[in-house]
Amino acid sequence: MDNRRLLLAVLLSLAVLILWQYLFPAKPPVRVPTQTAAGSTAAGKTLSTPAGTPVPEPGGPATPALPPTTVAAAANPADPQAIAEREERVVLENGQTRAELSNRGAQLVSFVLRQDRTADGKPLELVRARTGGLYPFGLVGRDLAPLPLDGALFAIESRDPTGVTFRYNGPLGTARKSFRFDKDGLLTAEVTVPGRNDWSLAIGPGIRNPTAAELGSRYQSRSAVWDLGGNVETLDTRKAERRELPAAGLRFVGVEDSYYLSAVIPGRGLAATVLQPVLLETGTGGAVTRFIPVPSKDQITKEQESLAREFLLVLRPESDTLALNSYWGAKAYERLAALPYGLDKTVDFGTFGIVARPLLAGLHWIYGHIVHNYGWAIVLMTVLIKIVLLPLTHKSYVSMRKMQDLNPKMQSIRDRYKGKMKDKQGRPNLEAQRKMNEEIMGLYKSEGVNPAGGCLPMLVQLPILFAFYRMLTAAVELRNAPWALWIHDLSTADPYYVLPIVMSLTQFLQQRMTPMAGDPAQRRMFMMMPFVMLFLFLPSPSGLVLYWLTNNILTIIQQGVYNHLKQRQEA
């Protein structure tokens, strides 16, 4: 065990970590048995649905359709008629969030985060653009087709700056929907549809319009997420797999991408939630023009493979009334952790989350108190980590140097046993191997060298390095955050690939400063590493590459100091 093999092992482990995320971007959750999805023709063909039309509800035996006179229930004669003359929009505001609801169907047509911006500087819209039809909080029937009420013009019964109540009582039926921002900034909703048991509430499909860069990045994901009984699971949209979740034990369920979340926290009256995958056909500006139900992934045709995939949340009520809270916003860890619903678990910091969370807090502090630039905050954070780990690094270096000094003596022992490692029949000579190892261990003992002394300090550092790496890929704070010059978004790749190329050059220089192993195979592996790292980091977020580049530069400086001190001692 020497420093060259250890360095090679560390570099390979980092490469494997990044390559694993590239090849296997999301670990599939434990499969819950589901019923065969309905919603296809007898021949198994996928049904297509116009924009805003929900998909047929899969699962279980089909429920006989209600007669048209029942589906389009008449107005309740005991209540005064409540029908609006024209469509009207109601705006609710809470701090930096702005919700816009239409009285047509009493649906959420816009949810804007003023502090978050698009690439062109506009406030970020979380409701995915569409050409019309079903919006979040729309009403659908047992077959997931829109109820006639979904297109009705609801009267506005009451309103104030943070809440509104819509009511409809007319030829299309009777319903009441109330929306309000609560003290935590969540949008609460209460929906009542009296006299019928065939309705559900639909939310989605998906969340916000992803950019082309986000769709092409392996670091970006879109999925459904839920907490059932304290276990948080995700289901990637690419799997196109339907799930049905019981209400018992369900803390939240939602749709997410890497940075934003739309989640429902059940209140009262929820019977079950269906995660229905759909394919999206889009038009100008990414607006959804049509969505197509996906009974199962194997029914997606070759022509449909290129279509975007999302989840539609279908909330089934137990009776007339369904009440819930909903979170619409960024997956900002500190914001989510302050809420009592466990939504902070949707921020995926990986295996070393216990280390990544304080690192994120430190990054916030540096940004808020020192530099006000997340790029420079990453640089300073990397310097601080390097300083904190300096005692371990020094201990590792001293131990490795002692091992290097012993290399000639160890090689002499190996040379003496070189011709004795096999017997006359060509079989391994275990006795000779045992004696050689005993002599080497005796040499370690006599020289006061611990063969693991150089390895253990570096292994202690790895969780910190991995956690910082994972934190940078999950931090929404880096989205649209500039650094300097041409780097305008630390969450996306360098458009000119300057950072990854410079990073690979520093990797090469770092290896040149480290004594190369005598083994030609190891030497070739070391020579390949800068090219492997370049390949892995070309499409990586520039914030992540900046961290790695800074770490390489600091390591080069550190190695240069060690080499200089060694030369002075040998002089």
Show which residues each predicted segment covers.
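Selective for proline/serine-rich intrinsically disordered segments
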Residues: 48, 52-66, 75-78, 134, ...
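Soluble non-transmembrane domains of integral membrane proteins
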Residues: 89-346
